[in-house]
């Protein structure tokens, strides 16, 4: 619905104004500059983020550096035959396209 001057009632329609968060006042007299006590608490207290539980690496697990250093020839992969790996179609015999025969059963029933 479009508002026109004919159906305008003063005070009935007010523009919505978004409220703002309160701003910090610089130079506040309540600001405490003594940080010697708070620095000790920061060392002992967990500051946030993802907690990490350090565990020893198992003997069977290889390092990430060894993974990047392996050449493609030396790496053992599940698909060892290059023709079977991937679906690029390289090295495969091309299949001939077989067009579908038109289905006339629907025409006969009508």
Swiss-Prot record:
Post-translational modification: Monoubiquitinated at Lys-15 and Lys-24 during normal S phase, promoting its association with PCNA. Also diubiquitinated at these 2 sites. Following DNA damage, monoubiquitin chains at Lys-15 and Lys-24 are probably extended, leading to disrupt the interaction with PCNA. Polyubiquitinated by the APC/C complex at the mitotic exit, leading to its degradation by the proteasome.
Molecular-function annotations in GO: chromatin binding; molecular adaptor activity
Main location: nucleus
Annotated Low complexity bias: 29-39
UniProt key word DNA repair: yes
BP terms from Gene Ontology: centrosome cycle; DNA damage response; DNA replication; regulation of cell cycle; response to UV; translesion synthesis
Record motif Initiation motif, residues: 84-96
Motif (D-box): 23-34
Domain of life: Eukaryota
Cross-link (Glycyl lysine isopeptide (Lys-Gly) (interchain with G-Cter in ubiquitin)): 15, 24
PTM annotation (Phosphoserine): residues: 28, 71
Sequence motif KEN box, location on chain: 77-79
Keywords assigned by UniProt, alphabetized: Acetylation, Cytoplasm, DNA damage, DNA repair, Isopeptide bond, Nucleus, Phosphoprotein, Ubl conjugation
Region (Disordered): 29-110
Bias kind Basic and acidic residues: ranges: 71-80
Any one GO cellular component localisation term in the record: nucleus
Modified residues (N6-acetyllysine): 24
Motif PIP-box: chain residues: 61-71
Subcellular location: Nucleus; Cytoplasm, Perinuclear region
Free-text comment about domains: The PIP-box mediates the interaction with PCNA. The KEN box is required for the association with the APC/C complex.
Quaternary structure, from the entry: Interacts (when monoubiquitinated at Lys-15 and Lys-24) with PCNA. Interacts with isoform 2/p33ING1b of ING1. Interacts with BRCA1.
Function: PCNA-binding protein that acts as a regulator of DNA repair during DNA replication. Following DNA damage, the interaction with PCNA is disrupted, facilitating the interaction between monoubiquitinated PCNA and the translesion DNA synthesis DNA polymerase eta (POLH) at stalled replisomes, facilitating the bypass of replication-fork-blocking lesions. Also acts as a regulator of centrosome number.
PANTHER family to which the protein is assigned, alphabetical: PCNA-ASSOCIATED FACTOR
Name listed for the protein in its UniProt record: PCNA-associated factor
Annotated source species: Rattus norvegicus (Rat)
Gene this chain is encoded by: Pclaf
């Amino acid at each position: 619905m479009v508002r026109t001057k004919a159906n305008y009632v003063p005070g009935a329609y007010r523009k919505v104004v978004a409220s703002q968060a309160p701003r910090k006042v610089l130079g506040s007299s309540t600001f405490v500059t003594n940080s010697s006590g708070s620095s000790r608490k920061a060392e002992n207290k967990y500051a946030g983020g993802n907690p990490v539980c350090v565990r020893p690496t198992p003997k069977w697990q290889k390092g990430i550096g060894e993974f990047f250093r392996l050449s493609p020839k030396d790496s053992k992969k599940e698909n060892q035959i290059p023709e079977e790996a991937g679906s690029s179609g390289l090295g495969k015999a091309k299949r001939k396209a077989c067009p579908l025969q038109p289905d006339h059963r629907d025409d006969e029933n009508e």
